């Protein structure tokens, strides 16, 4: 068995990563691939909490720009994260990983309500916990949710699983050939360099809790496991104040 560096993690999966090449919606093939990747980490006896984004279906900020009330648009985004979480739960259970879904907005017919102590108990019993519905409040991103849940469950690290992006760059490498990749940054660097990794609320919370983040490409097979065992891939973002 590989020696793990992080014994309890929050895995933040962007909505776009669940869509794959389709660009929107949920790609069952991608779900199956992710489930196997997560199982490889689960088999190392790592405690896993998962937060899914919803950008493959809906973005509250986009809805607000089109004239919707921002709070209403954000609630729609929360529902999108729950749909993604249910799809991932199904994929994980198909490969034999016991999984519980908890939502910040109660919908008991399909998931448990989010209760921190219950989530901790699930993790102690060796279950993966998927946190759906964001924080349950409008104006807060799923990146903030990941930072919050990481603090609440005592995670050692937040893994920012990106769709085709292998770290943090000085500019968009797809459009700027001079863009350089950072191997390590601090949360203050993100703000001072105006790097669009996560919103400032999420950065501030991560800085306060001093939980590190690792940004990496989830599309590369084996990358989640490589990060957990301590291989140097992606970009490490320290929570140093």
Swiss-Prot record:
Q: What is this protein called?
A: Uridylate kinase
How does its activity get regulated?
Allosterically activated by GTP. Inhibited by UTP.
The organism is Lactobacillus helveticus (strain DPC 4571)
Q: Which domain of life is it from?
A: Bacteria
NCBIfam families given in the database record: pyrH_bact (TIGR02075)
Q: What class of enzyme is it?
A: transferase
- How does this polypeptide assemble, per the annotation? Homohexamer.
**Signal peptide interval:** none
